[in-house]
From Swiss-Prot:
The gene is namA. It comes from Bacillus cereus (strain Q1). The keyword Oxidoreductase applies. Gene3D superfamilies: Aldolase class I (3.20.20.70). This is NADPH dehydrogenase. Pfam families: Oxidored_FMN (PF00724).
Length: 345
């Protein structure tokens, strides 16, 4: 029997062998605080590739040093960082998967000794530092940094780029009226709040012709914040600019209580897919093969982003295949150990 979860998926000239994506998750493991890939990262990402994930996405990787969430985040702000990232893509490719990278700037959520930057001088909460409102010069420099990061991503061998526009980081801060109180061309109307992301996409398109994803927070969980319907319009603009897929997460723009349950964010992937007519990725408490297969069969999303479940077991695709009764092609090195992997957590 054929299963959609294990069917190929092609975006532009990149074909994924299945619909399982390793969701980008910060590991805070650049131990020398220099943004460099370490041996841990090579093992971490390489193992998920060997575990038969279709697309392995490297964690949020800072386009500028001051754009890191922590001082142990990965970076792509300098050419000296390309070699390490290329080792990671080689590990991933050699183990049968495609490689993606999430380009990011933490904005006001950067927990560093340096000043935090944001569209407006509003802290995330009472315990975090007051950010500095970005000047137009700083905005232009950041747009350029995303473009340069895209060039380095290509040189490092990545197949896919994802722009991190979610979880209350810099791009998300520009998009949301809760965090963007500017009175210039980067604030006010939805068109103006989208301008920063528009310029980033434009700049990346000048140097990158591969698949381009954007991760969004499709719900601010605040009465004065953005909802999924607001993101339909944002997504239509992204699609016009050539974005290929929207990775639909939610929250973390402002402190909020979120009702979390299995597949709680799938509704956003479905809504964006239906109303903006674009491919989407579903993410958030998707933990079984049957659940993932149902999402795809219901046409609620095109790709399944798996996060913590892949931290629990890097061989999640094998477990999902066993659960569904699908015979997954194994790495030849493991063929001497056929049979089921335990699904015990």
């Amino acid at each position: 029997m054929n299963y959609k979860l294990f069917s190929p998926y092609t975006i532009k000239d990149v074909t994924l062998k299945n619909r399982i994506v390793m969701s980008p998750m910060c590991m805070y493991s650049s131990k020398n605080e220099d943004g460099q890939i370490t041996n841990f990262h090579l093992i971490h990402y390489g193992t998920r590739a060997a575990g038969q994930v279709g697309l392995v996405m490297i964690e949020a990787t800072a386009v500028l040093p001051e754009g890191r969430i922590s001082n142990k985040d990965l970076g792509i702000w300098d050419d000296s960082l390309i070699e390490g990232l290329h080792k990671a893509t080689t590990f991933i490719h050699d183990n049968g998967a495609k490689a993606a990278i999430q380009l990011a700037h933490a904005g006001r959520k950067a927990e560093l000794e340096t000043d935090a930057l944001a569209p407006s001088a509003i802290p995330f909460n009472e315990t975090m530092k007051m950010p500095i409102e970005m000047s137009k010069h700083q905005i232009k420099d950041t747009v350029l940094a995303f473009q340069q990061a895209a060039v380095r991503s290509k040189q490092a061998g990545f197949d896919v780029i994802e722009i991190h526009g979610a979880h209350g980081y810099l791009i998300n801060e520009f998009l949301s009226p809760l965090t963007n109180k500017r009175t210039d061309e980067y604030g006010g109307s939805p068109e103006n709040r989208y301008r920063f992301l528009r310029e980033i996409i434009e700049s990346i398109n000048e140097v990158w012709n591969g698949p381009l994803f954007v991760r969004i927070s499709a719900n601010d969980y605040h009465p004065d914040g953005l909802t999924v319907q607001d993101y339909v319009q944002y997504t239509k603009w992204m699609k016009e600019q050539g974005v290929d897929l929207i990775d639909c997460s939610s929250g973390a723009v402002v402190p909020a209580r979120i009702d979390v349950y299995p597949g709680y964010q799938v509704q956003y992937a479905k809504h964006i897919k239906e109303h903006a007519n674009i491919a989407t990725g579903a993410v958030g408490l998707i933990t079984t093969g049957a659940q993932a297969e149902q999402i795809l069969n219901n046409n609620e999303a095109d790709l399944i982003f798996i996060g913590r479940e892949l931290l629990r077991n890097p061989y999640f695709p094998r477990i999902a295949a066993n659960e569904l009764g699908f015979e997954l092609e194994e790495p030849y090195q493991y063929e001497r150990a056929p049979g089921k992997i335990s699904t015990n957590k």
